[in-house]
């Protein structure tokens, strides 16, 4: 696999992690230490999982790590909402970070769709459409009474 730093999604995720780092440094108060830590760790996890997955030997493994990165995007989004609602970050910091998070999430979904790695349940990773089960052969049976 090629160098993860060349992936646009990794570059955007890395930029997001730096934005979150700057935001976390401005969150004050010991009562917010857990929120600060979780937000920071979730943000750092996104580019880390992209990088780790890119080094794997198969698209299936890469897709699995992209799924982890997507989960971390959701976690970042939630922690940002909490930080905004508790007034520990500014509205402008929230808007900037949430916009970057949404961009990264869309890019991850796009990359997953291009990989088209089937999951065990017949769903293509990252898609919203499941494969339809094949109808059983044979005549329909009458309902029993």
Describe the residue ranges of each PLM region:
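Short, C-terminally biased terminal segments at protein or domain edges
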Residues: 1-145
């Amino acid at each position: 696999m090629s160098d993860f730093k060349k992936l646009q999604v990794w570059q955007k995720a890395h930029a997001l992690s730096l934005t979150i780092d700057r935001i976390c440094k401005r969150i004050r108060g010991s009562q917010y230490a857990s929120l600060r830590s979780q937000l920071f760790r979730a943000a750092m996890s996104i580019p880390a999982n992209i990088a780790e997955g890119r080094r794997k030997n198969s698209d299936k493994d890469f897709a699995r790590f992209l799924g982890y990165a997507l989960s971390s995007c959701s976690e970042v989004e939630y922690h940002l909402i909490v930080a905004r609602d508790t007034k520990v970050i500014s509205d402008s910091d929230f808007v900037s970070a949430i916009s970057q998070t949404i961009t990264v999430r869309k890019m991850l979904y796009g990359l997953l769709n291009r990989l088209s790695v089937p999951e065990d349940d017949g769903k293509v990773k990252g898609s919203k459409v499941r494969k339809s089960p094949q109808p059983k052969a044979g005549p329909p049976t009458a309902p029993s009474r």
